Regions:
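A conserved acidic beta->alpha catalytic loop
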Residues: 41-50, 69
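Short, flexible, basic/aromatic active-site loop/helix in glycosyltransferases
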Residues: 123, 136-156, 160
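Conserved short acidic donor-positioning loop in nucleotide-sugar-dependent glycosyltransferases
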Residues: 26, 42-43, 71, 95-96
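Short beta-strand-to-loop acidic/aromatic patch adjacent to the donor-nucleotide binding site
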Residues: 87-98
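Glycine-rich, basic loop-to-helix element that forms the pyrophosphate-binding segment
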Residues: 67-85
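Conserved donor NDP-sugar-binding/catalytic core segment of glycosyltransferases
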Residues: 103-136
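Short, acidic, metal-binding catalytic loop of nucleotide-sugar glycosyltransferases
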Residues: 24-34
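Cell-envelope/extracellular polymer assembly enzymes that use nucleotide-activated donors
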Residues: 5-7, 36
Length: 172
């Protein structure tokens, strides 16, 4: 059993310019389930750690600084997935990304139930810091087709943001 239906996991290293917006976009999500945010800070030195601490008053936020300094994005992601407070669905958000609206997390979790799947990959829009669209624009993962098969992730590097997984599969 999971205490949280979903956990948004943000691995971060030296992203003081973007981490606040990423965190705000998660904490403003409107969902009909309990969720939390796990930020794994890989020993940032640019003020990122202090920026994350600004949100310490929100008990949905778990701020982790791993013992090791060499984890990288994958090691930080794994630390989040294996944290005891990680929810039933682990949703990765990059530290320089924001959700497009307050219902994004709800849509991701709904997709798990509607499609009876273990992984959800969504569409995203490339923008500058003023949220103006820049090339290549909308990334829609049209390469994920029935013709390409369910194991297309093994053939292409198409696991773009947003991406989410059924946590028990990741922990197996």
């Amino acid at each position: 059993n999971f205490e949280f239906e979903a956990s948004v996991i943000i691995p971060v290293f030296n992203r003081v310019r973007t981490i606040r917006d990423a965190i705000k976009s998660v904490l403003c999500q409107e969902a009909n389930f309990k969720y939390n945010l796990i930020v794994i800070d890989n020993h940032s030195t640019d003020g990122t750690t202090e920026a994350i601490k600004e949100f310490a008053g929100d008990d949905r936020l778990i701020h982790l600084i791993p013992e090791r300094k060499d984890l990288g994005i994958g090691g930080c992601w794994n630390a989040g997935v294996h944290h005891p407070k990680c929810g039933k669905f682990a949703v990765q958000l990059d530290s320089d990304d924001v959700y497009s609206g307050p219902d994004t997390l709800q849509k991701i979790v709904n997709a798990f139930y509607e499609q009876n799947c273990a992984m959800v990959v969504g569409t995203y829009k490339m923008t500058n810091f003023n949220m103006e669209m820049i090339a290549p624009g909308i990334i829609d993962h049209k390469e994920w087709t029935p013709e390409n098969g369910r194991n297309n992730a093994l053939r292409i590097n198409g696991l773009g943001a947003p991406r989410a997984f059924y946590t028990p599969v990741l922990r197996a």
